[in-house]
Structures are given as C-alpha cells and as structure tokens.
Curated annotation (Swiss-Prot):
Organism (species): Homo sapiens (Human)
Name used for this protein in its record: Galactoside alpha-(1,2)-fucosyltransferase 1
Protein family according to the UniProt entry: Belongs to the glycosyltransferase 11 family.
Organism placement in taxonomy: Eukaryota, Metazoa, Chordata, Craniata, Vertebrata
The protein's Enzyme Commission number: 2.4.1.69, 2.4.1.344
Subcellular location: Golgi apparatus, Golgi stack membrane
Listed result of changing L242R: Found in individuals with Bombay phenotype
Note: There are two genes (FUT1 and FUT2) which encode galactoside 2-L-fucosyltransferase. They are expressed in a tissue-specific manner with expression restricted to cells of mesodermal or endodermal origin respectively.
Length: 365
C-alpha cells in the first residue's frame, strides 16, 4: 500500500514538473530565439513563421538599447510587401515612408530591398528588415504602380505579396504616422553632430554674433535645368524667388542666418544677394554624398525649398516654417497629371509663385 502511494506521489510530482515547464515555455517563448520549436509541447500554439528569408545588415538597429538588429513583426501582420528602390536619395525616402504606411494600414509586413538599405541605412536609423535577393526572385509578386497621392483603393489592398513601384512622396500617405516617420529618419549621431558643429561655427556677418535662427535653403539645379523647361514646361527657383523667400523670414524672425545648400553652388554664389551678411554657403553640393547637405538642412529651424523630394524631406524633418516654390509649371503641363500640389505640400507651408515668363518667351514662335 505504501509503495503504491509513493509511486502515485512520484507520478503526480513528475506531472506537475512537466506542466510547469510547458507553462514556463509558453509564457516566455518570446525570450527565446525565433523559431524555437514549441509546437510539440503546445500543439495549439502556431508559430508565425514568415514565408520569406530575410537578412539584416548593419544599420538596421531598432534603437540604442536594442538587443537585436532584426526587428520582430507583430504576430497580427501577414504577407510580404516591398517597394522598388527607384531614383535618388529623396525618392527612396518617399518610397520607404509610403511602403511603411501602406503596409501598416493593410496589416502587412514590410521589407526593403538591399539597394534601398544601401542608400538609407548609412544615414538613418531605419528599422525595416531587408529581403534576401533569392527570396525576392522566387516570390510571386503582384506589382502595383502608385501615383503620388493617397487614394481610397490603397486602404484596401488584399494582395499578400505586393511590390510597390513609382515615386510616391506625398504627405497624404504617411502624415498620420509623422512621429514614427521622423524616428525612422533619425540621423546617425556622427552626422547630426557634424552638422551641428558646422552650424555652431556660423556668425552673423555684420555683428559677428551667434545666430539664433537657422533657415536651411535647398536650391535644386543640375538636371532640372533641362528637364523642367523641356519636358514639363516648368521652371526652377530663380534669384527673385529666393530673395522673396528670405525676405519672408527676415520679416518674421529676428536675425536669421540662411544656410544654402545646392547641387549648383556656383550659381548660388553668383545670384543670391549676400549684402545683408546673413547668408552662408555651407553645403558641399556633392550628389554622390547627399547626406552631408541633408543633415545640415534637417538641423536648421526652418526651410526654404525650391522643387524636388530632397527639399521636401529636409523641410518635413526640420519642422518649423517652410516656404516653397508654387505654380512652377504652365497650366497645360503634363506634370500636373502626376503631381498634385495640395498633396505635395503641407497645408501650413507657404507658397510663393514662380516667375513663368521665361516659359512664355520660349513658347513664342
């Protein structure tokens, strides 16, 4: 009798131990490496295993206290979405932000391709994981060309494997996630510190005082000098526009300093009025390393932009007041079929109309 009771007691103790281990693993399984096989112990618990292979590259850390550079997607998300990394620096920022926003809106997991990671990760603390090329090539994608403003159909995309394309850079896609977008596009410390060091050395020309208000000025030139008039019946920002924009800030802010960056710095030095001693040409204009100029602009208090996504993102991240070039194409421009000003510029930004007279001159026989 005693032996039987002792045996039953041992079996009961063993059963309690096994159940305790199962309960512990069930509660704490997120602390173990992803993919730990608990399905045998907990058959009702299905592991969410993505139908893709990913790899994380340097620069995708979630934060200074993150223990892993590979962010974990919430279990409620499914599918795999990505975006073609087309265009230059500002274009790819727009594609990244739009992918992130649309994927969240539709309950999908977002991944970026290696080329986008190579363009953005050296500059920002981005967190989206990277899709392996071999998985990209094997995935049965449906491709979707986006236009540059949010549409109702984009809120109900049911494709589990979707590859976005186009050049979206409209606040209407992602402005409801502004703080998250700003975190994604947080500069690495060394870039921020370098930009702040440059700004800290600036002095007002007439008094030698430290400026208290910095206005970043981005002047887009380069290929736009031909593309805008020849293809889009448009203009780029001229000296008259820049003078009006600077005067707008001078009237509203005490002793601002204008920090000019451009991919046409020689033109800027010859055409921007510096007689008031409040203009400095601080950018290096190197299109191969745009993040230096970009970092400078984002560390300013306010922004003057001409045209282009580079200037948009500098203004969006800097915050403060923004003045932009408005109505820079003729009314019959094909550009207006793919570009909506009300979706491109935030409502609180201030537009100054472009001078279109050079285009009317070209149009005359």
């Amino acid at each position: 009798m005693w032996l039987r009771s002792h045996r039953q007691l041992c079996l009961a103790f063993l059963l309690v131990c096994v159940l305790s281990v199962i309960f512990f693993l069930h509660i704490h399984q997120d602390s173990f490496p992803h993919g730990l096989g608990l399905s045998i112990l907990c058959p009702d618990r299905r592991l969410v295993t993505p139908p893709v292979a990913i790899f994380c590259l340097p620069g995708t850390a979630m934060g200074p206290n993150a223990s892993s550079s590979c962010p974990q997607h919430p279990a409620s998300l499914s599918g795999t979405w990505t975006v073609y990394p087309n265009g230059r620096f500002g274009n790819q920022m727009g594609q990244y932000a739009t992918l992130l926003a649309l994927a969240q809106l539709n309950g999908r997991r977002a991944f970026i391709l290696p080329a986008m990671h190579a363009a953005l990760a050296p500059v920002f603390r981005i967190t989206l994981p990277v899709l392996a090329p071999e998985v990209d090539s094997r995935t049965p994608w449906r491709e979707l060309q986006l236009h540059d403003w949010m549409s109702e159909e984009y809120a109900d995309l049911r494709d589990p494997f979707l590859k976005l394309s186009g050049f979206p850079c409209s606040w209407t896609f992602f402005h409801h996630l502004r703080e998250q977008i700003r975190r994604e596009f947080t500069l690495h410390d060394h870039l921020r510190e370098e930009a702040q060091s440059v700004l800290g050395q600036l002095r007002l020309g007439r008094t030698g005082d430290r400026p208290r208000t910095f206005v970043g000025v981005h002047v887009r030139r380069g290929d736009y000098l031909q593309v805008m008039p020849q293809r889009w019946k448009g203009v780029v920002g001229d000296s008259a526009y820049l003078r009006q924009a600077m005067d707008w800030f001078r009237a509203r802010h005490e002793a601002p300093v204008f920090v000019v960056t451009s991919n046409g710095m020689e033109w800027c030095k010859e055409n921007i009025d510096t007689s008031q001693g409040d203009v400095t040409f601080a950018g290096d204009g190197q299109e191969a390393t745009p993040w230096k100029d970009f970092a400078l602009l984002t560390q300013c208090n306010h922004t003057i932009m001409t045209i282009g996504t580079f200037g948009f993102w500098a203004a969006y991240l800097a915050g403060g007041d923004t003045v932009y070039l408005a109505n820079f194409t003729l009314p019959d421009s094909e550009f207006l079929k793919i570009f909506k000003p009300e979706a491109a510029f935030l409502p609180e930004w201030v537009g100054i109309n472009a001078d279109l007279s050079p285009l009317w001159t070209l149009a005359k026989p």
